[in-house]
Structures are given as structure tokens and as C-alpha cells.
């Protein structure tokens, strides 16, 4: 994304710090609410004794951090304002300084242009991938054996469905590129190892997360925490989603991995609420995912943060410091929303309240930032 969008944002005088934030904000926050993703498969695998994929889908409307991050990107773009350190970089970008760090651009990536390329050549493979993954998940759920659509999707094996969908989408994409003579079959095959290499870190993180989960399970951590909370929390159970959100955020920030946070917290959340309050369990699982993504989003040692700054060719420290006020703003609004959601558990009402808080918060910040600029 960074290599594709750099020429576009440079021509519109958008700073590299702003570009890196937009890349980072459209990475994990989008993946965590996308049913057709490896994140859905990972989260589903941490929910034992339950329909993991169904729980993931039901938790999407309660994932306030991801939803509010998207809303924030839209609002600061439409209202055309920035605050914190980002404001300085955007002001300098309008004057032609896209970096503001006294360092010249080091574009070490080679750019290849194909005169026969079209926009459809980029969009069509993505659409084919989505369709194939959906069909793969329906196949794993028994849809083509007579199971109805809803039951097949809810009972699907996300890992199998995504793997099948990816394989067929890859084959169709290679066939399409060869027929369009954009790339030869050999060139397509030469690109495959780079895709495999790109997934190695994610596979290692997931493997370590499963290992950590197995260790906590062997120690009986989930049962211990569940029993302790059930005895001590009492009427304060409604506050747990907000508390879980904070714990997940701090844990992911310290470790730099959201998937590892999933592996630790989700089994504990399921053990606490599974037999007592299923609705609060959904909200708490979503709070766990939201907190993990929040901490991962702003952690300087997170792989997504590092890749975002590298993709935008922005200094890593600059990216971390400029996006931190934005992350804290969304995290604060999400925390307040989870506090209310523990008592008001209606999906639509909470979405209205949450988005209203987000808009009001940004409006106040916009007014304060505007007053500082005119002062």
C-alpha cells in the first residue's frame, strides 16, 4: 500500500507521517472486523467449546476501537485538520517538506511500470480472492451438501476455507495475468516465494501465541481467573469489558503482538462468561480484540507499526510519536463506550452513542486546535 500510494500522497502534499498513520490505521483495525481474513481464523481458534467464527462475527459491532479508528480517519480528512505533532508535519508538507526530519528520501525499492496495466488488473484479483474465500468457507461448512447458508457459514472452518479460497484465487489470478500478457507464467512463479516469505512472521507469531495459550491452559490460568472474578466482581461484572480493553491494550503495547494477546485473554474471557452471561461474553471478547489492536497499533515494536513506517518511508520514531495522540483519542472514546456498553447492551444504541462521542470529541479537539493556530 505504501509503495502504491506514495506518489499519490506526495502529489497532494501529504506528509509521510500522515501517510504512515493512514496505512497503520487501515491495517489491523480493518483486519479485526473482516470475517474473511486470517485474523478471523486466529481468533476463532482461541475460542474452545464455542462456535468461534460465529462469535467473531457477532463481536464485530462491539469492536469500538476499530470502528472509531475508521470514523476518525474519515472525519479528520473531511474536516481537514490535524493536531499534536502531526499538525506540524502536515503544515510543513504544504510547504513542500514531506519529511520534516532533515533526511532525504531513500527510495531503495525499484518501481516497475507495465504499459498494458489497468486498474482492473489490481481490483479483479482482490475480488476473486474474496469470492473464493467465501465459497471456500461455505464448502467447509457443508453448504454444497445441503446445509443452509447461515448454518454453513456459522459452522465453517475458517482456516480450511481461507486456504482453499487462497489457492483457487492464486491459480485464477495467474491464469488471468498470463492471458492478459501482463506477466509470464515464470514471472508469476518467481513472485510466489516473496508472498510465502511475507507470511512467515505471522505464522511464527501465531505459533508462539498457541504455545503461550497451551502453557496458560496447563497452569489452569483461565479457571483460576474465572473463579476469582466470579467471586470478587459480583455486581461489577458490567465494568469488565472496559477493564479487559485496558488490559489488552497495555499487554499488546508491551509485547508488540495482538495475536499473542488474543491467545492469553480470549480463553480467560470465555471461561468467565461462558456459563453466566453470553451477551457480556461477546462484548468482552470484542473488548479484548479492540484492546489488543489498540496496543498493537501504537506499539513501537509492533510488526504492523514497523511495516507502516517502512512502507511510507517515514522515520519510525516520527510515525510512532505523530500517531500516538490519535490512538489515545480513539482509545479514550472506546474505553468510555465500553463502560456504557456493560450496562446498555443494545448494539444499535451503543453504536449511536459511541459514534456521537467520537464526533463530539473530534469537534472539540478541532476547535481547540483552530484556536491555537489563530492565537
Placement of each model-derived feature along the sequence:
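Transmembrane helix-loop junctions in multi-pass membrane proteins
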Residues: 45-50, 82, 134-147, 178-185, ...
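Transmembrane helical cores of multi-pass ion-transport proteins
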Residues: 6, 10-12, 16-20, 25, ...
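Membrane-interfacial loop-to-helix junctions in multi-pass transporters
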Residues: 12-19, 62-64, 118-120, 158-163, ...
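Core transmembrane alpha-helical segments of multi-pass membrane transporters/permeases
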Residues: 117-126, 131, 154-221, 238-250, ...
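Long, contiguous bundles of hydrophobic transmembrane helices that form the permeation core
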Residues: 54, 69-155, 167-191, 317-324, ...
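Hydrophobic transmembrane alpha-helices that form the pore/transport pathway of multi-pass ion
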Residues: 1-53, 254-294, 304-318, 362-367
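Membrane-embedded alpha-helical segments of transport systems
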Residues: 19-43, 57-78, 120-124, 128, ...
Amino acid at each position: 500500500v505504501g509503495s502504491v500510494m506514495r506518489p499519490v500522497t506526495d502529489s497532494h502534499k501529504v506528509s509521510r507521517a500522515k501517510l504512515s498513520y493512514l496505512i497503520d490505521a487501515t491495517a489491523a483495525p480493518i483486519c479485526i472486523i473482516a470475517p474473511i481474513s486470517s485474523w478471523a481464523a486466529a481468533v476463532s481458534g482461541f475460542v474452545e467449546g464455542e462456535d468461534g467464527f460465529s462469535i467473531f462475527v457477532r463481536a464485530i459491532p462491539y469492536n469500538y476501537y476499530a470502528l472509531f479508528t475508521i470514523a476518525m480517519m474519515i472525519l479528520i480528512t473531511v474536516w481537514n485538520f490535524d493536531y499534536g505533532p502531526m499538525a506540524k508535519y502536515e503544515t510543513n508538507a504544504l510547504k513542500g517538506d514531506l519529511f520534516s526530519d532533515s533526511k532525504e528520501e531513500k527510495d531503495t525499492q525499484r518501481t516497475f511500470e507495465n504499459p498494458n496495466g489497468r486498474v482492473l488488473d489490481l481490483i479483479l484479483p482482490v475480488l476473486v480472492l474474496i469470492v473464493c474465500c467465501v465459497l471456500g468457507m461455505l464448502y467447509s461448512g457443508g453448504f454444497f451438501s445441503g446445509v443452509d447458508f447461515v448454518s454453513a457459514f456459522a459452522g465453517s472452518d475458517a482456516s480450511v476455507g481461507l486456504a482453499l479460497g487462497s489457492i483457487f484465487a492464486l491459480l485464477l489470478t495467474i491464469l488471468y495475468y498470463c492471458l492478459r500478457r501482463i506477466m509470464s507464467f515464470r514471472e508469476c512463479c518467481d513472485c510466489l516465494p516473496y508472498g510465502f516469505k511475507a507470511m512467515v512472521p505471522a505464522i511464527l507469531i501465531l505459533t508462539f501465541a498457541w504455545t503461550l495459550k497451551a502453557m496458560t491452559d496447563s497452569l489452569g490460568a483461565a479457571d483460576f481467573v474465572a473463579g476469582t472474578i466470579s467471586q470478587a466482581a459480583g455486581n461489577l461484572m458490567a465494568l469488565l469489558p472496559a477493564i479487559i480493553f485496558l488490559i489488552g491494550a497495555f499487554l499488546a503495547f508491551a509485547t508488540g503482538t495482538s495475536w499473542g494477546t488474543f491467545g492469553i485473554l480470549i480463553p480467560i474471557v470465555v471461561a468467565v462468561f461462558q456459563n453466566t452471561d453470553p451477551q457480556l461474553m461477546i462484548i468482552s471478547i470484542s473488548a479484548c480484540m479492540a484492546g489488543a489492536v489498540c496496543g498493537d497499533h501504537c506499539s513501537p515494536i509492533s510488526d504492523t507499526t514497523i511495516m507502516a513506517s517502512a512502507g511510507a518511508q517515514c522515520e519510525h520514531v516520527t510515525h510512532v510519536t505523530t500517531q500516538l495522540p490519535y490512538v489515545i483519542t480513539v482509545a479514550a472514546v472506546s474505553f468510555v463506550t465500553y463502560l456504557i456498553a456493560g450496562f446498555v447492551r443494545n448494539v444499535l444504541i451503543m453504536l449511536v452513542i459511541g459514534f456521537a462521542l467520537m464526533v463530539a470529541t473530534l469537534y472539540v479537539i478541532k476547535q481547540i486546535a483552530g484556536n491555537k493556530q489563530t492565537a
